[in-house]
């Protein structure tokens, strides 16, 4: 999934197309794959967070004999990605699923009898979701509090706000949003919903704004930002999917293959960092990034939303006995 970023307008056959989105750290990601695979290699890529298809476009263009497995939990995003990749349709297999559900049995059911050599996860929320989906990911407009990346499954943010008990809401806001005012916000939500349900982004944003004293508002950010992040993570179970998905994908990755993951906040990055570190200790994987690769200043200037991106990379160097997989290791200092 491509993260929030600037838009560019493409043309096809002389006709202007709908603006599409700039792929965060696209140059760096492509360069890593170029260093590990030859241009003419029949590489099988897996884009576990297809988004608008921007990263996949780069891979298919650079590696003319490659194929790609395109996955996204949102059917609308998958459709948009397929439209963007229409020139490569014979080399694309699309699967509407969360990357945490990808395994060899699923791939085989789609006629894929190989394992991927190059895997990408872009964990950022897309510009489409934030500003064009109408699902309440942003408080720029008054929208229903949905926040589901797959609009056809799971509880909405509105249901969570109006059903969950106070202590559970407080824990969500504190754990996923690192919000110091979590207790007070949860208390006010519970009292407010006794009179009227909280159902729109404006209602929630205004409620939070009134609770947090202005002197404690984060510089340059709306005071409800952390609450919206926490709700989105809970609605979509994002952290659990990252943890479980990495286990499946690292086991699935072909010998000699490379997995690259872009994270956008500390909760995501901590899971990726610890998972990659633990697998590297098994001697079946090589950590290619002791420290994450950050966006260049040029990219940040061009696309300020990329500022928080962190890219981590792992290569599979040999098969790992199942009994050693997902083993817990002594924690290194954070």
Swiss-Prot record:
Catalytic EC class: transferase
Primary role: Specifically methylates the N4 position of cytidine in position 1402 (C1402) of 16S rRNA.
Coiled coil ranges: none
One GO molecular-function entry: rRNA (cytosine-N4-)-methyltransferase activity
InterPro entries xref list: RsmH, SAM-dep_MeTrfase_MraW_recog, SAM-dependent_MTases_sf
Principal location: cytoplasm
Alphabetized UniProt keyword annotations: Cytoplasm, Methyltransferase, rRNA processing, S-adenosyl-L-methionine, Transferase
Keyword Cytoplasm among UniProt keywords: yes
Cell location: Cytoplasm
SUPFAM superfamilies: Putative methyltransferase TM0872, insert domain, S-adenosyl-L-methionine-dependent methyltransferases
Upper classification of the organism: Bacteria, Pseudomonadati, Spirochaetota, Spirochaetia, Leptospirales
Source organism, top-level taxon: Bacteria
Protein family (similarity comment): Belongs to the methyltransferase superfamily. RsmH family.
Classification via PANTHER family: 12S RRNA N4-METHYLCYTIDINE METHYLTRANSFERASE, S-ADENOSYL-METHYLTRANSFERASE MRAW
Protein residues bound to S-adenosyl-L-methionine: 53-55, 72, 99, 122, 129
Protein name as annotated: Ribosomal RNA small subunit methyltransferase H
An individual GO BP term: rRNA base methylation
Enzyme Commission numbers on file: 2.1.1.199
GO cellular component: cytoplasm
Catalytic activity field: cytidine(1402) in 16S rRNA + S-adenosyl-L-methionine = N(4)-methylcytidine(1402) in 16S rRNA + S-adenosyl-L-homocysteine + H(+)
């Amino acid at each position: 999934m491509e993260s929030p970023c600037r838009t560019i307008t493409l043309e096809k056959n002389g006709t202007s197309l709908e603006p599409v989105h700039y792929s965060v750290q696209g140059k760096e990601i492509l360069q890593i794959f170029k260093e590990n695979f030859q241009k003419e290699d029949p590489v099988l890529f897996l884009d576990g967070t297809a988004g608008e298809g921007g990263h996949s476009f780069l891979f298919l263009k650079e590696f003319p004999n490659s194929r790609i497995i395109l996955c996204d939990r949102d059917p609308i995003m998958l459709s948009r990605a397929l439209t963007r990749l229409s020139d490569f349709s014979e080399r694309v297999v699309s699967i509407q699923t969360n990357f945490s559900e990808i395994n060899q049995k699923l791939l085989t059911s789609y006629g894929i009898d190989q394992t991927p050599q190059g895997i990408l996860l872009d964990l950022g929320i897309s510009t489409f979701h934030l500003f064009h989906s109408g699902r309440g990911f942003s408080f720029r407009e008054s929208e229903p509090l949905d926040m589901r990346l797959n609009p056809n499954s799971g509880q909405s943010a509105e249901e969570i706000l109006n059903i969950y008990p106070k202590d559970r809401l407080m824990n969500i806001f504190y754990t996923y949003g690192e919000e110091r005012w979590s207790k007070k916000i949860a208390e006010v939500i519970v009292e407010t919903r006794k009179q009227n349900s909280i159902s729109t982004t404006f209602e929630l944003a205004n409620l939070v704004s009134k609770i947090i004293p202005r002197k404690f508002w984060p510089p340059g950010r709306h005071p409800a930002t952390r609450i919206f992040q926490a709700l989105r993570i809970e609605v979509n179970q994002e952290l659990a999917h990252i943890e479980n998905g990495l286990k499946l994908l690292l086991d699935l990755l072909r010998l000699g293959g490379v997995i690259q993951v872009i994270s956008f906040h500390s909760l995501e990055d901590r899971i990726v960092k610890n998972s990659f570190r633990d697998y590297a200790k098994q001697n079946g994987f090589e950590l290619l990034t002791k420290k994450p690769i950050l966006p260049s200043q040029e990219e940040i200037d061009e696309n300020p939303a990329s500022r928080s991106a962190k890219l981590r990379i792992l290569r599979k160097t040999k098969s790992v006995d199942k009994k050693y997989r997902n083993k817990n290791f002594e924690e290194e200092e954070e």
